[in-house]
Each structure stands twice: as structure tokens, then as C-alpha cells.
A protein has these predicted regions:
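Peripheral, non-transmembrane regulatory/ligand-interaction domains of membrane transport proteins
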Residues: 2-215, 221-224, 228-235
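Hydrophobic alpha-helical transmembrane segments and their immediately adjacent juxtamembrane loops
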Residues: 53-54, 230-284
Length: 284
């Protein structure tokens, strides 16, 4: 059934293998392959689970947007779930949030499971990563984790740039639209910070994990991943603090402007009331 799905050209299941000419897509799963599942159907999950002796619930877990980051060691495979950053366009605006991403390590293959074709993975599929080999499974995991950490940093810089642009607009016109955009960016930073801290726990456990072979040549790469992730956490915190301070400052400005407007209206009301009082008094 699995081979049939592949022959039918499933877009949800793709198999990649490193050859002398680089990364290429193959039709049959061979030892040392990378099997990528992107938003797979129930049938594809079931056939994959049966073919490779993986619990179907573990394959489904990364497809649940509420799934928490963790490492789970089973008898014949290890499941790693962490959060990755993503962008979604709604009504002409970009929204930043995170979704789960699963890596399954077996003695022959690497599986990845995700709801979308994330830039975290597409660079590997396109052969744009140096020293990437599907059969070097431990290094491949570290490379994906490193790519994920750098994507967080990249998106954080975009969020910071967007917040600067919105702030400039607020200086000119304090409209609700700009304030809502600032709130959305602040919410994105909260998502990122929470996800990065969850990923940090996974990385710490990965350092102590023995189910995935560790090689001396790859140790530095894992250390780099941890450093990049910590840097992303610090950057998210700094940007969040700055954004919160900016929001508070503009809230104070708006409140002051409102007070001034209310005082002005009170004066106008009194001025308009005086003639009425005088007229009433003379009428009496």
C-alpha cells in the first residue's frame, strides 16, 4: 500500500536521498533516506505507521497545533517534537506564530512530520545546505535544529522592523489599526518566547539523550544550536520589552490627549451654557 501511494505521486509523502550528484527525490524508501510527511492524510499516516512500525499516534502528534515540545524514546525509534516559526497572511497582513514540527529517528531512516512545507525544511529539499547528507542522521537532526533557530532569529528581526514601521505611523496618526498591529506583533513575540523556551528544554534533553548516536564531529554543531536558541530567547525578550514600553507610552499619550480634549469640551460647554443662564435670569 505504501509503494502504491508513492507511485500515485503523493504530494504529502516525499522521499529524499543524498547521492554523489546531491540530494534527489526517490520513489522507494532505502536505508539512509529522509521521508518527509507534509500535512499527510489519515491513510498516508496509517500506511507509514504500518510500513515502518511506528505508532500512528506519534505520527499524528506533530499535526496537532497544541502539541507540546518533547523527546519521546520508544523501542525502535525516537520522536522529537519542537516548535517552528511560520508566517500566515490574513487580509493583506502577515501574522507570525509557531506550529509543531516532528522528527522521528530510526536505525535506517529520518522522518519529518509537519503541517506545512516550512522554510526550515525546503532548504534541505532544494540542496542548499552545505555538508548535508540524509544518511548522516544525527548531523541532519542538528542541522534542522540549527536552521530552525536561525529562522526564529530571522523572523524576530522582521517583527522588530515591522514594529518600527508601525511606531512611525503612530507618531503621525494614532488610529486603531496601528494599535491593533502593535498588539498582534506583541502577541507573536509571546508565542515565539514560549516556543523557544520549550525548544530549549528539548535541546537540553537532547544533550543527555543516548537513544540517538552522538559523534564528536557533530558536537560543536549541537552547541551552536543551543547558543542560537538562547540568543533568540534573549532577542524575543528584548523586543517584547521594547514593544510593551512603546505600547504603554502611546497609551499614556492617548490618555493625555483624551484628557485635554475633555477639558476643552468642558470649557466649550460652560461657554455655551452661560448665555442660556443669563437669558433665563433676565426672563425671570
Amino acid at each position: 500500500r505504501y509503494d502504491k501511494l508513492l507511485k500515485e505521486g503523493s504530494l504529502m509523502i516525499r522521499i529524499f536521498k543524498t547521492t554523489d550528484s546531491g540530494i534527489r527525490k526517490v520513489a522507494v524508501a532505502e536505508e539512509g533516506c529522509w521521508i518527509a510527511l507534509t500535512n499527510p492524510t489519515a491513510e498516508e499516516l496509517s500506511t507509514t505507521a504500518d510500513q515502518f512500525n511506528i505508532d500512528v499516534d506519534d505520527l499524528k502528534s506533530p499535526l496537532d497545533e497544541e502539541e507540546r515540545s518533547r523527546i519521546q524514546v520508544e523501542e525502535n525509534y525516537t520522536l522529537i517534537i519542537l516548535d517552528i516559526p511560520t508566517i500566515e497572511e490574513r487580509k493583506g497582513r502577515e501574522y507570525f506564530y509557531t506550529i509543531p514540527f516532528g522528527i522521528i529517528f530510526t536505525d535506517k531512516y529520518i522522518f519529518t512530520v509537519c503541517l506545512v512545507d516550512s522554510p526550515v525544511l525546503t532548504v534541505f529539499m532544494d540542496g542548499r545546505v552545505k555538508d548535508f547528507y540524509t544518511y548522516k542522521r544525527t548531523r541532519f537532526i542538528y542541522q534542522m535544529l540549527y536552521r530552525n533557530a536561525t529562522m526564529f532569529l530571522q523572523y524576530l528581526k522582521i517583527i522588530d522592523k515591522k514594529s518600527d514601521e508601525v511606531e512611525k505611523k503612530l507618531h503621525i496618526s494614532q488610529r486603531n489599526q496601528e494599535l491593533i498591529e502593535m498588539l498582534d506583533l506583541e502577541k507573536s513575540l509571546v508565542y515565539f518566547t514560549t516556543s523557544l523556551r520549550g525548544n530549549e528544554v528539548v535541546l537540553e534533553k537532547l544533550m543527555r539523550n543516548t537513544s540517538i548516536p552522538r559523534y564528536e564531529d557533530d558536537e560543536e554543531l549541537l552547541e551552536d544550536v543551543i547558543i542560537e536558541n538562547k540568543q533568540a530567547i534573549e532577542m524575543a525578550k528584548i523586543y517584547s520589552d521594547i514593544l510593551s514600553g512603546t505600547m504603554d507610552a502611546f497609551a499614556s499619550v492617548i490618555s493625555n490627549n483624551l484628557n485635554i480634549a475633555m477639558k476643552f469640551l468642558s470649557v466649550i460647554t460652560i461657554v455655551l451654557t452661560v448665555p442660556t443662564i443669563v437669558t433665563s435670569a433676565l426672563g425671570m
